[in-house]
Structure formats: C-alpha cells, structure tokens
C-alpha cells in the first residue's frame, strides 16, 4: 500500500504531433501539479504555452535521470505532486522515466497514469496488420547489432510481426538488412503521424527501397 502522506507521481501522455490530441484529464493534472519533469523542457514549454499553463518545470531525461532521481523522490515524499512527461506520447515507452516509476513503487509512493497518444499503437492501428500479437523492438539498434536482432527474430517462431522506431537517416539501411535477412516481406511505414505532412507506406520491402 502507498503511504498516504506522500505526494503523487503522475505519468502523463502528451500529443505525438497534433497538440489538440491531449485529454481533458491530462490538462487538469498539468494545471494542478506542483512540478512538471520533462524530457526536454523546451518542447514541453511549447505544449504548456499552447494551453496557457504555467508551472515550474525541470528536465528529466536519459542524461540526468539517475543523478536527479533521489531528489525527486524526496520531494514526492514531502507531499509534492509531480507530473512526468516525455517529448511526445507516453513516458517510458522508448523514453526515459522507468527508473523513477520503479523507485516510486519501491518507496510506496503513489503512481497514477494519465493515458494518452502513442506512436506505436497509432501506427499499428492503421497498418493493415493484426494488432493482437506483435513484438515491439523500441528503437532499432545500429549496424551489426541490428542484423543480430533481425536474425534472432527470424529464428523465433513465436514472432510473426514486429514493430520498431527508426530515424529517417537510418531507415534505408534498416530496410536493406530486413530484405537480406527476412526477405521481401510485407511492411508498413508511418511518419509524421497526426501532423500536417503525415505519410504512410504499405507494400513490400523491395517496393520501399
């Protein structure tokens, strides 16, 4: 059981592109908390400004999370209510923050999720592939680690479909590795989801190349 004298960590989902894709509850929480910890305060400032929200904000990301976590835990124990957000989508899903959530569980600090958009589930929903079972890689590794992972996927009979994030700069090399290891399979690619220039591709790897 959580200690009722402690504060609350709110894990808040934010838009993945279109700023209007945010829940009323998320806005209520962001307006009510004592502090917002953000992956990139500049990007989160843009969202808060759009909705007229002014709150103290600090960075909390891969570079500084392990240094800051003890201080954040102490403030939560003092009764503060803190919202954790990422640059886009749900925190922790291929984003920083899992270590803070774990510490809160260990320290009996209440954690509440405020669900929101996810690039992963949004892409799967419009992919044309079944969404009942798939393997999520996260961000695809680079070079030989990528090829090693693809070979493991090929050898695993339980994995029929998989999803991953990739940067535009590395996409071509990743597709070439998929073609060489998994063959000319059907794929779906989405970019700029919910934004003005949203694009999709459905077809084979060779067609994408």
Predicted regions and their residues:
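Class I SAM-dependent methyltransferase SAM-binding "motif I" and its flanking Rossmann-like core
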Residues: 99-157
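A contiguous loop/helix-start segment that scaffolds small-molecule binding in enzyme catalytic cores
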Residues: 6, 160-209
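Short active-site oxyanion
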Residues: 30-36, 108-111, 161-162
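Loop/turn-to-beta-strand initiation segments
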Residues: 7-9, 79-83, 160-161
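Conserved helicase motor
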Residues: 59-66, 139-143
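Short glycine-rich anion-binding loops that position phosphate/pyrophosphate groups of nucleotides
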Residues: 16-17, 87-91, 168-170, 193
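Glycine-rich, flexible N-terminal cofactor/catalytic loop recognition
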Residues: 1-62
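Glycine/small-residue-rich loop that forms an oxyanion/phosphate-binding "nest" at active or ligand-binding sites
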Residues: 69-118
């Amino acid at each position: 059981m959580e200690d009722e004298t402690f504060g609350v960590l709110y894990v808040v989902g934010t838009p993945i592109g279109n700023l209007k894709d945010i829940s009323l509850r998320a806005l209520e929480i962001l307006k009510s908390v004592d502090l917002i910890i953000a992956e990139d305060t500049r990007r989160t400032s843009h969202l808060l400004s759009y909705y007229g929200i002014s709150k103290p904000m600090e960075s909390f990301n891969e570079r500084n999370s392990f240094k800051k976590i003890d201080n954040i835990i102490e403030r939560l124990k003092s009764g503060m209510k803190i919202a954790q957000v990422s640059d886009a989508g749900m925190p922790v899903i291929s984003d920083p923050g899992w270590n803070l959530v774990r510490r809160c569980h260990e320290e009996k600090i209440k954690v509440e999720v405020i669900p929101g958009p996810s690039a992963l589930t949004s892409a799967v929903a419009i992919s044309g592939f079944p969404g009942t079972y798939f393997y999520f890689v996260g961000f695809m590794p680079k070079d030989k680690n990528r090829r090693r992972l693809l070979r493991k996927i090929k050898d695993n009979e339980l994995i029929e479909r998989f999803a991953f994030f990739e940067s535009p700069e590395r996409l071509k090399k990743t597709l070439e590795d998929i073609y060489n290891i998994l063959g000319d399979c059907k794929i779906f690619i989405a970019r700029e989801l919910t934004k003005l220039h949203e694009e999709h591709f459905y077809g084979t790897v060779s067609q994408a190349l």
